[in-house]
């Protein structure tokens, strides 16, 4: 359990004043000018020492990512882009930061931008996040009026602007290069890499793309020291993290907890337990819709961090759990996710464009039991042909949930096919 004095987000539930005055009263924007005065190299070294990894799902070391930006300008401006396009089913943590604690993000953007020599930050917010956009824009306006950003930000002789861009609802724009394309006014389709954004990103200029939570935790890390953050959790999985729980828990929520907390403790302590008790648990998707499902017997000792989820043949992702009880039709649940990825594919890569549609059609047949048993292996084979063969990771995201389903629930799939053939499906439906 995380100690209260180690918490970074002081208003995640919106119980306090989210204005600049309220944020300052809770300790935000405290000594920001002094932090900037320590210089770019000090900031990046502290972030590296903290062990902070990207909170958007990939888990790339944040300090290392910042260090890829050019130290000296070649005449092109540098930019920080904040990915607030939180569009994956089950993921709902960043919206709480933007809606209730927006000043953590803006202060973090200023410090991160300074560390990378960026001229401005662009916050790309999900199209459906209307109230979040209003709260964030109001906070940005407050900071401009107070002189915290803009010309001579925080009286540091550093000019830094923050722009808020409202997306149009495309999931694919959550991929960093598709996001950059969208910001430039083009169709949101991922770019080939290299060149990477740090070399040629927004408008062909050096750019770093970070998740909302990754940026929002930076000011507190620098105030308390990288060693403090590194002392929470376990090696390679350090710090505090926002976890979300939805589905069949008694109290769905977003909560700030220490990394490496056990899944069972997280669900029992903060989610109010599984609906009907822990024995009624069927499966958990641990980090948003793109992560392979984990069956109940593996959830008993599952550790919620990058390494812990890898050991369970899944992924930590965004740490937003989707909990499913024994009454869940797991095949139908994964088929619904398959439909989402099919719908959101941009169509640029053939394996993803054709593969997601094909996988969804087979999944629909598995739901009704109309498929043949041989199609299970064929479906798994197709997921492997899609995985790793696309420009971006949407192909992987579409393949992994299906792989997890077949890996752990093959017997249930086969039983449904046999039930259809023997007429048991009609009897089951009647019950």
Curated annotation (Swiss-Prot):
GO terms for molecular function: 4 iron, 4 sulfur cluster binding; FMN binding; metal ion binding; NAD binding; NADH dehydrogenase (ubiquinone) activity; quinone binding. It catalyses: a quinone + NADH + 5 H(+)(in) = a quinol + NAD(+) + 4 H(+)(out). It comes from the Bacteria. It is an enzyme of class 7 (translocase). NAD(+) binds at residues 54-63. Its EC number is 7.1.1.-. This is NADH-quinone oxidoreductase subunit F. It comes from Rhodobacter capsulatus. The lineage of its organism: Bacteria, Pseudomonadati, Pseudomonadota, Alphaproteobacteria, Rhodobacterales.
